[in-house]
């Protein structure tokens, strides 16, 4: 396959840096966020006011991290830097100032790739989308169908304030969902006179009723209003004027307790048309009065007042790493402040130093808690480069301060018109999280306020202005403009060609002449996310299948020999580069040295820059990370050039699967219901072979009876089993291990209780002889095998941090090559997924007119009902490209080049391919896109022509090796005594309610009886059955299942007198077989009972 790629598109706009959202946010935290927090806590004064501690936030510094990224991963450490901040302790009485640099904690640092390394594991902080602070106006209908309006002032932190109207035209206010208070009571408590309020309102007559209501309640002065406020907010406490004053002050006017944030101030100013400066982040009288005025205008339906849509992206903002971390630092500093105040009060004033006051523990704990256990700090999905990139661009509505799955309704999950170009309408999980977890669109970015913006070209008099940088608009700015889609047809000068253009204006569609268009979208791809933009012919797929295609590309396993797609969208290179999986040249220069582990580039000044390559590293998902150089010694390179391919990359492009020859035809029922029939070639030629690296770990602990020992001297183990172990008892690198083999030999001291009485007697007579030990070695689990690729030993002597109680930890990494096999899951890029049902010899596969056997047979019935026709376009375009020996890039949404353009393009390519000498059979005008195949077993042609072509097919991470499982006897649940579930617990298969109905329907009574008793939770019965099988005797009759006894006990515990009786009315004791004496006779078997016995029963 030659590497020439044809670009079927007019303009290519380069995407922005795709991980920018993570990096920019963390940079903001280091530059501004951390300083803001430190300075907001300064100064801290003690309770007497004598001492003050100032943090000089702008002078904080970070020390060099103790380990670099690779070292931190290897040692299971955190890649973090120590934070120091200058503190000044001022003694007000003596005027003495002590200044000192104080350690305040460790801050995990972001790697270049936008991830964090916490305890050796790479983690990602997911962006959270939350409701923006500001003021919101809503309407509600009461029981009688009358509309009432309300206004909520939502701060970044602090108490919510809600104004509402009622049927009597009175205005009320609630603070944090407490009881209603007359709105005028709050005005008076805030020190506003009646005239102050009335002068500010455009329709004061509506408000006068509330003034009268307040007067009728006898609240006419500020003091009475404060008392009333205190009574409502703190019921049950004795009210006082000073208490009311303090309550009001702390709730709304104290910057430490109430903060609108920059965003909240910006939104309130915008909505209420105010000009209060950015620095005022608490409520002002003006805010409250303007809110009241707007609410009255809404109620009277005048003055252009409008309601807010809370699902509009102008009212939702993104909190990225920096802000989430800043909030966590605030929590830590709050705890620290309390400690400092206590220490100031307790300590000796003269001898105190800042270092004695500041204890780093609370801050360290808060940061650790955030990175270790927050819902938004996630173990990075490293299955392939696309999965990694998508994880960093994920936007979640869940998490602290966000929604919960159960409470989120349909409105929140739905696609909103303002998502256009900001959040992808396609990529979201299936299941309970649908719509709550989204992906950032390709060109979107997050602005300084946390709102998502998307770029446009300006249009002037119907001409698109493409010179200079595009203009980024947030959702609420865009609503006021007429925006045309990115696939409008233009001439070479940018003049829009059509007479009427469909535009979006105020979340609606209308058609306008080109002169009225304000902006045009940058690119047709900007609506969708990165994963979705890799699907060619996306516009021909149903959205549900495109969603599955986007999600399944992230589950593709990196293959041993990746192959980039024949038909791509042109974004493959950027995805590979921005994922951080491929090393990129930092300078212009020449390659002076290349081998498997490093590449050296010499720049124009003669300095060498070394790039080390990852070799067979284990990823978080046990896939293999490996980099292969693609430059040669002496090659010139430029800044930004890809030097090596990472996993699932080829030629600097992302390559998740293989291009294979596919026929859409049924074959002997082997592709019924989405099953896939594949050729043996995929196995023999290692097309879908992948490397998986498993990690096994064992620690030698200090026990009460003495230390555990890692050793080669293992009791009762044959010498041949120890052949691959070194003198310490650890497996050698390069050894091939099967299930049950010893990886690390370990012995544990046996306790006295483990010994039989005769041994204890001998011990007592002869004193301490050789202490007995038990074999506790690390062995390969039952279904695994592979080659040992790495062994790491951690001990205290080497300075490694070990878990408490451990003296030594040994880790063994075992790599296995997994060929494709029956039961593995495969998928295309269009949501066409299936399970391999049979692997056929290539001589039996259907073959083409030139004798080439196809690789995969898919069921044609999988296409029409699912409406993912994109796969057929890809198939035929791939067929043409393979025969023309080129690769094709097609940007999705191509109607701007004319109607039915995809079809015309594919047809033109097929015709061109068929025009080559000797290739006229490729395209049949009578049956375009189909060929007459022959059966590989008989050589006879099939009845109908078949669609054949090349498609990019992936092997997904759901491998049958990890799922297949069998149980003979194993562990049981404690209460119900039923077998556990799942492969990890060595569990059984659950026979549920419906399966019981199926057996009942057949009348298979005895099968059902043993499934519900001896094969499940009849404890005595199952032991006797096992015994009988071993001794070859007939199986005894089952007894009572344990779950039935549990049910009886539960009913009895409710106080119900419930018991089991025989026909004669004799009570059956269900507990008699719990402590069976040796003397109890075994139960009768079916064979031992005669016919007469059955009649008695």
From Swiss-Prot:
Coiled-coil region: none
Pfam families xref list: RNA_pol_Rpb2_1, RNA_pol_Rpb2_2, RNA_pol_Rpb2_3, RNA_pol_Rpb2_45, RNA_pol_Rpb2_6, RNA_pol_Rpb2_7
Cysteine pairs bridged by disulfides in the record: none
Entry keyword annotation includes Isomerase: no
Function: DNA-dependent RNA polymerase catalyzes the transcription of DNA into RNA using the four ribonucleoside triphosphates as substrates.
NCBIfam families according to UniProt: PRK00405.1, rpoB
UniProt protein name: DNA-directed RNA polymerase subunit beta
